[in-house]
Amino acid sequence: MPAGVPMSTYLKMLAASLLAMCAGAEVVHRYYRPDLTIPEIPPKRGELKTELLGLKERKHKPQISQQEELK
């Protein structure tokens, strides 16, 4: 096994790591409960909290790298 660790110790660490990962995911999922409701009327533009503000209309031109200018 890696670094000379016995197989039993390796499997115990693997099991403990997986258990901790699953427990952490469960706690986070219970704390941040997803909103699974589906509205009958779709929300108007801008009402969704998940809408990215960076994708809206830009006020300035994006910078072009020097490599792209040379092409």
UniProtKB/Swiss-Prot annotation:
- Span-the-membrane segments of this chain are 9-25
Specify where the region named Disordered lies, as residue ranges.
52-71
Where's it found, cell-wise?
Mitochondrion inner membrane
Offer one Pfam family short name for this entry. DUF4516
Tell me the GO BP annotations in alphabetical order.
mitochondrial cytochrome c oxidase assembly; mitochondrial respiratory chain complex III assembly
Keywords annotated in UniProt: Membrane, Mitochondrion, Mitochondrion inner membrane, Signal-anchor, Transmembrane, Transmembrane helix
Q: Name one GO cellular component term.
A: mitochondrial inner membrane
The segments annotated as topological domain Mitochondrial intermembrane are 26-71
Per UniProt, what is the membrane topology?
A: Single-pass type II membrane protein
The residues on the Mitochondrial matrix side of the membrane are: 1-8
- Going by the entry's taxonomy, the superkingdom of the source organism is recorded as Eukaryota
Q: Which InterPro entries match?
A: BRAWNIN
| Oligomeric form and interacting partners | Interacts with UQCRC1. Interacts with UQCRQ. Interacts with UQCC5. Forms a complex, named COMB/coordinator of mitochondrial CYTB biogenesis, composed of UQCC1, UQCC2, UQCC4, UQCC5 and UQCC6; stabilizes nascent cytochrome b/MT-CYB and promotes its membrane insertion. Forms a complex, named COMA, composed of UQCC1, UQCC2 and UQCC4; activates MT-CYB translation. Forms a complex, named COMC, composed of UQCC1, UQCC2; UQCC3 and UQCC4; mediates MT-CYB hemylation and association with the first nuclear-encoded complex III subunit UQCRQ. Interacts with MT-CYB.
User: Which family, according to UniProt?
Assistant: Belongs to the UQCC6 family.
What is the documented function of this protein? Required for the assembly and stability of the mitochondrial ubiquinol-cytochrome c reductase complex (complex III (CIII) or cytochrome b-c1 complex), a multisubunit transmembrane complex that is part of the mitochondrial electron transport chain (ETC) which drives oxidative phosphorylation. Mediates early complex III biogenesis. Participates in regulating the levels of electron transport chain proteins, and therefore energy supply, in response to changes in energy demand. Also required for cytochrome c oxidase complex (complex IV) assembly.
What's the protein called, per UniProt?
A: Ubiquinol-cytochrome c reductase complex assembly factor 6
The organism is: Pongo abelii (Sumatran orangutan)
